[in-house]
């Protein structure tokens, strides 16, 4: 309270009020310290300053700086070690996760068993064997452009093992070969087995192959004018029936893209089998009833053996996914006439297959960015033309027919029994007259690579449980990789340690040089020299004697 006639009031307080204020101040400071501790803001430590009149001030400051740098390096090294440990743990967790996933996959594969190992080739081989077992007469469909290359000795041997089965050859696509060449092929093949030339009706891909779609505007599709060879084949099949009441099953076999399903559609006069421009359309066995006495069995394509020539594998295999286009084109060009191919594509003279494909790309405008010829696209174009109908080619029959080891005179007589050879020759001659054969000038002569081998036993396609061996090998590889990674990490750590030690040595040497230079300067300025090492050795330091 301000006293009268005085400018300032008294600072005297009651003890109760003073103690109360002090208590509030203490509480406030305590809360402030607590908040500062939570927020992480701490009081900066007061730097230890060295007085100017202290001896060896430069050395002391350098020593303090060196210790600070060492502490900082230790912090960085600890941080790197922690990061490495975290990365190692993360890698271990990822490896454990991958191993658990692989174990699950391994268990699933074991549970599935052999069903998971089955492929499309195994299924095709199985259905072909079913057709051979159920058939009374086997009809092997050959491509008239290359009859020798589309013939399979393994399938013929499988048919001839059973004495009650008959084997016939059907020379399909007979309208794509010159007439004189076709006559020579008929003479060669008929000397071994009964052979019938055939031309299928134009086939349209059926959207629903299960239904029978009648072809419009065709009263009699299987006449000699529309389907040459159809009546001859039906007559032979009817003659092989044991009686009018008994029906026979005729199995149709052959390699891919020879026209097995098209033959059945032409004989049935409707689209009962699925057909398409791609190979391997038929995947399973299909039974079609032509009449009360004949039942046709459509089969998948024969599985090509990988031991054949590369060109035979490319031309006869079902899948074209793994085909090297440029290698296939190179093999095709080696087996066909160069001049005829140049005339067909209007190309100049070329030296090798790569130059041919390059010229074809320039001719057709197949260019990449910058006008570079697209050889891959040109090779695919030539390969597709050869596999399709755009490239018209044929093979010359051999001068001396080769003797097939499984075809003997007894086999030929047994297969021809019940079939009049003279009548068959007359029917084939009339079929050739009904065909519209092309001129040899418009075709390319192709050299056949010989008969194509097939795989008839599905056990040759299924490997005996390779899953466990592969997984064990993979585990071994992973262990080797882990050891390799561990050794690499150890080497990296050793290199890092060497680098760090080298850096430390450099820093220490630099500091020693600085200390020496500082000593020289101090000695010059101070006059009498004082040994710092001696001072370190003497623990008792006397300021009265050593410091002036």
From Swiss-Prot:
Region called Disordered, residue ranges: 1-118, 459-548
GO BP, sorted A to Z: regulation of cell population proliferation
GO cellular component, one term: nucleus
Record keywords: Coiled coil, GTP-binding, Nucleotide-binding, Nucleus
Biased composition (Basic and acidic residues): 64-107, 501-523
Gene: gnl3
Subcellular location: Nucleus; Nucleus, Nucleolus
Domain remark in the UniProt entry: In contrast to other GTP-binding proteins, this family is characterized by a circular permutation of the GTPase motifs described by a G4-G1-G3 pattern.
Coiled-coil blocks: 58-114
UniProt-recorded name of the protein: Guanine nucleotide-binding protein-like 3
Residues that hold GTP according to the record: 172-175, 256-263, 298-301
Lineage of producing organism: Eukaryota, Metazoa, Chordata, Craniata, Vertebrata
Composition skew (Polar residues), residue ranges: 524-534
PROSITE patterns attached to this UniProt entry: G_CP
Organism of derivation: Xenopus tropicalis (Western clawed frog)
Statement: the UniProt record of this protein carries the keyword Heme: no
């Amino acid at each position: 309270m301000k006293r009268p006639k005085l400018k300032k009031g008294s600072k005297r307080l009651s003890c109760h009020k003073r103690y109360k204020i002090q208590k509030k101040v203490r509480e406030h400071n305590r809360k402030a310290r607590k908040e500062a501790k939570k927020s992480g803001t701490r009081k900066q430590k007061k730097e230890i300053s060295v007085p100017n009149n202290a001896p060896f001030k430069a050395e002391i400051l350098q020593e303090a700086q060196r210790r600070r740098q060492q502490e900082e390096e230790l912090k960085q090294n600890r941080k790197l070690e922690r990061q490495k440990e975290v990365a190692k743990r993360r890698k271990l967790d990822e490896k454990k996760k991958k191993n658990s996933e692989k174990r699950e996959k391994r268990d699933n594969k074991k549970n599935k068993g052999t069903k998971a190992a089955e492929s499309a080739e195994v299924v095709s081989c199985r259905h072909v064997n079913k057709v051979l077992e159920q058939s009374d007469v086997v009809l092997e469909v050959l491509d008239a452009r290359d009859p020798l290359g589309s013939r399979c000795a393994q399938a013929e041997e499988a048919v001839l093992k059973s004495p009650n089965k008959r084997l016939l050859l059907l020379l399909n696509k007979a309208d794509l070969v010159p007439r004189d060449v076709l006559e020579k092929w008929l003479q060669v093949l008929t000397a071994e087995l009964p052979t019938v030339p055939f031309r299928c009706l134009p086939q349209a891909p059926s959207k629903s192959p299960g239904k029978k779609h009648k072809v419009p505007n065709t009263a009699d599709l299987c006449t000699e004018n529309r389907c040459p060879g159809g009546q001859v084949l039906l007559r032979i099949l009817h003659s092989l029936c044991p009686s009018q009441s008994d029906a026979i099953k005729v199995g149709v076999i052959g390699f891919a893209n020879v026209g097995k399903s098209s033959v059945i559609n032409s004989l049935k006069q409707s689209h009962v089998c699925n057909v398409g421009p791609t190979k391997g359309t038929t995947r399973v066995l299909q039974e079609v009833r032509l009449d009360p006495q004949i039942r046709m069995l459509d089969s998948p394509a024969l599985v090509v053996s990988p031991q054949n020539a590369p060109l035979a594998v490319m031309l006869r295999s079902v899948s074209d996914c793994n085909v090297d286009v440029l290698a296939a084109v190179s093999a095709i060009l080696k087996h066909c006439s160069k001049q005829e191919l140049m005339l067909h594509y209007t190309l100049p003279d070329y030296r090798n297959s790569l130059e041919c494909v390059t010229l074809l790309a320039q001719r057709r405008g197949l260019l990449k960015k910058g006008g570079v010829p697209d050889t891959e696209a040109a090779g695919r174009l030539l390969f597709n033309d050869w596999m399709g109908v755009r490239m018209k080619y044929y093979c010359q029959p051999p001068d001396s027919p080769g003797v097939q080891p499984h075809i003997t005179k007894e086999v030929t007589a047994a297969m021809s029994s019940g079939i009049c050879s003279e009548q068959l020759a007359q029917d084939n001659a009339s079929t050739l007259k009904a065909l519209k054969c092309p001129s040899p000038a418009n075709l390319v002569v192709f050299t056949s690579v010989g008969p194509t081998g097939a795989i008839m036993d599905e056990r040759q396609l299924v490997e005996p449980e390779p899953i466990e061996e592969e997984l064990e090998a993979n585990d071994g590889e992973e262990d080797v990789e882990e050891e390799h990674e561990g050794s690499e990490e150890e080497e990296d750590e050793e290199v890092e340690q060497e680098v760090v030690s080298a850096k430390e040595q450099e820093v220490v040497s630099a500091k020693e040089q600085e200390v020496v230079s500082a000593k020289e300067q101090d000695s010059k300025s101070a006059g009498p020299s004082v040994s710092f090492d001696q001072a370190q050795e003497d623990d008792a330091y006397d300021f009265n004697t050593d410091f002036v």
